[in-house]
């Protein structure tokens, strides 16, 4: 049976007590789960959540990281600091980082290479704006973001890389691509990966869907051939909405 990768991006939500409570509930709910799981809390919550998840089947993720190991980078958190609190994976290139904080493909690529250098798993987010989709450029945008985001990343590091497709127009809007539309873009992404790394490597890579996945639409999306998991935002903030997605195939 196909193993899915379901990740919860908590974004800028919760205090320490709330985060520990939710992590505890998710740990209990997923303890017998057969899929791959990750939780990405805010930086200030990482240590508390790490203490809850220790020894569990849930990876501890970060939502971003700085582009250098240390030094004069006010407000940034380095890969070494993330490792120090037990982080195992990091989300890079999220649409909010690209479009609100103006992170470029080149900057994201530097972070990807730095994370992989230190052994972190990476979820590289790609996706188009509404105007790009309406102009028929969705596939080209994703292709560019993948090629630039993975520049100088070797095939041997691909087992630590996941691609998350985020149609930007569906993030936090309640809108979502149809399963057929999402699968078509995922197929295009896999073709791009095949051109870069070969058919076998592309077939083995995980491509998550990250556009307002929720219990009501998760099964329809995850049953599609090229959709291998979900990067979950709002539905990842409550066990009653996250667990049905995380356990849908069981």
UniProtKB/Swiss-Prot annotation:
Provide the protein's localization: Cytoplasm
Q: Which UniProt keywords apply?
A: Cytoplasm, Gluconeogenesis, Glycolysis, Isomerase
Query: What EC number(s) are associated with this protein in UniProt?
Result: 5.3.1.1
Q: Where is the active site?
A: 94, 166
Q: Which CDD domains match?
A: TIM
Q: Does the keyword Protein transport apply?
A: no
Pathway membership of this protein? Answer: Carbohydrate biosynthesis; gluconeogenesis; Carbohydrate degradation; glycolysis; D-glyceraldehyde 3-phosphate from glycerone phosphate: step 1/1
Sorted alphabetically, which InterPro entries does this protein's record hold? Aldolase_TIM (IPR013785), TIM_sf (IPR035990), TrioseP_Isoase_bac/euk (IPR022896), Triosephosphate_isomerase (IPR000652), Triosephosphate_isomerase_AS (IPR020861)
Which reaction(s) does its UniProt entry say it catalyses? D-glyceraldehyde 3-phosphate = dihydroxyacetone phosphate
Keyword Isomerase tagged: yes
Binding-site list for substrate: 9-11, 172, 212, 233-234
Enzyme class (EC, first level):
isomerase
Q: Which GO terms describe its molecular function?
A: triose-phosphate isomerase activity
**Biological process according to GO:** gluconeogenesis; glyceraldehyde-3-phosphate biosynthetic process; glycerol catabolic process; glycolytic process
Q: Name one GO cellular component term.
A: cytosol
Q: Name one Pfam family in it.
A: TIM
**What is its quaternary makeup?**
Homodimer.
Summarizing the function annotation, the protein's role is: Involved in the gluconeogenesis. Catalyzes stereospecifically the conversion of dihydroxyacetone phosphate (DHAP) to D-glyceraldehyde-3-phosphate (G3P).
The entry assigns this protein to a family as follows: Belongs to the triosephosphate isomerase family.
What is the designated name of this protein? Triosephosphate isomerase
Q: Which gene encodes it?
A: tpiA
